[in-house]
C-alpha cells in the first residue's frame, strides 16, 4: 500500500487513495501475467479487495475474505466516536480525553487536524494515542507498548487511516460497496468473520452476504478480529 510498510516515499499522501490502490493491484496482475486471480484479504484488505472486484469483476476468479469492513459512515462512527466506547470505556476515555471538550463531537476531525499539525510534538502524541487505542481494542491480549518514541508503523497506521476516513474513502457514496454488490453477486466468495469482532462488525459481513448469490458466510464463534487467534 502506498505510503507505508516498504513503500517509498514513506507517508506520501499525494495520489494515495483507494482508487490508486486498485490500479496498483491491476498493474501487479498484468505484470505477473495472471488472467484471473483469487483475492485473499482481511479487514481493510477486504474493503480494497471488494472495491477492486467491483471495478474489475472479470478478473476475479474467487474471493476469500475475513473481517468485512465496509468503511461506511456507521463503521467509522462505531470505532472512533460511539460504539466500541461502550465495550472498552477506559481505553476510549484516554482516546477521547486527549481532545479538548469543544472538539469531542467529532474525534476523527480533531485527530486529523493534529496529525497534520506543524507542532511535531503534538502530532506525535496524537498518533501514539490513536494507534495504541486501536491496537489495544483489536485484541484483548495486546499490551500498551513501553516505548516513549512513536514508532514508524504507528505513524503510518494513524496518518493513512485518518487520511482515508476523513475523506470518506474518496468515495461519492457512503455505501459504495453494498450499493454496487450487484456487480460481484455471482463471484464465488467465502467470508469468515469472528462473532466478537469489534473492529469490523459482523453485521457488515451479514449485509454483504445477503446481496450475493454465490457467498458462503462463516461466523466463527468465540473469536474477535485477528485471524491468528487460536481456538
Residue ranges and their predicted role:
Residues 1-16, 74:
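Glycine-rich "HGGG/HGxG" loop immediately N-terminal to the catalytic nucleophile
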Residues 19-38:
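Conserved acidic catalytic loop of the alpha/beta-hydrolase fold
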Residues 39-41, 66, 192:
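Short beta-strand immediately N-terminal to the catalytic nucleophile in serine-hydrolase-like folds
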Residues 46-57, 63:
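Short glycine-enriched nucleophile-adjacent loop
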Residues 58-110:
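A catalytic-pocket lid/entrance helix-loop region that shapes and gates access to the active site
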Residues 172, 198-204:
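Conserved alpha/beta-hydrolase "acid-adjacent" motif
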Residues 184-185, 191-193:
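Short beta-strand/loop motif that positions the catalytic acidic residue
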Residues 199, 220-231:
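Catalytic histidine-centered segment of alpha/beta-hydrolase-like enzymes
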